[in-house]
A protein has these predicted regions:
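Extended, well-folded catalytic/binding cores that form a central cleft or groove in large enzyme
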Residues: 1-189
Length: 189
């Protein structure tokens, strides 16, 4: 199976290989999916990839294998819901889509020292990057941070600029104001 994180408990007679992400190859795969399968299939794959399900990688792999098998480009691959992998990817994508739409209405920002807005969330799925466009359009003239406490990731927006994702971040706000703003200012750099 294809896992996106190292397993908590290892199995006997199984070999594990860690494969680093190659951004160049990832970009080529993205463009190929968009050009040959279309934006609807691409969106479903991206949504499923944001799922917290451990087997999402395997399901996505088999859907893409089916779509490109034998040199063909099956643009309607996501309509083959009788296929267990296609069905799984469709269900994962729907679950992720519902969750991030839910968060569009329920993310609450609080002002920190009059300098930026902060919202903390704990979504079940990894939806932070999916929220970037919505909130940057909604608050284009604000400095804001949406912090995923579960994954220790922050989506940072500086007034008039593009969103930036920061990983491995810990944000703690004990009161309504923060004395040392240095740690927060580093998020935008």
């Amino acid at each position: 199976s294809i896992q996106t994180s190292f397993p908590v408990s290892m199995e006997l007679f199984t070999s594990y290989r860690e494969i680093a992400t190659d951004q160049s190859k990832a970009g080529k795969v993205m463009r190929t999916i968009l050009m040959r399968l279309g934006s609807e299939v691409y969106e479903q794959i991206c949504l499923a990839a944001a799922s917290a399900d451990e087997d999402r990688g395997t399901a996505i792999y088999y859907v893409l294998h089916r779509a490109f098998w034998g040199g063909r480009c099956e643009k309607r691959v996501m309509e083959a819901l009788a296929d267990p992998y296609v069905s799984r990817v469709a269900k994962l994508a729907l679950c992720v889509k519902r969750e991030y739409h839910h968060y569009f209405g329920f993310v609450r920002f609080r002002e920190i020292s009059g300098r930026f807005l902060l919202a903390k969330i704990q979504p079940g799925n990894d939806i932070l990057s999916l929220m970037a466009l919505h909130f940057s359009n909604r608050f284009p003239n604000e400095n804001w941070v949406i912090y995923d406490e579960k994954r220790q990731k922050a989506l940072c927006h500086e007034k008039g600029k593009e969103c930036v994702m920061r990983k491995g971040v810990r944000i703690q706000v004990p009161g309504s104001t923060v004395g040392d703003m240095g740690e927060y200012e580093e998020l935008w750099q």
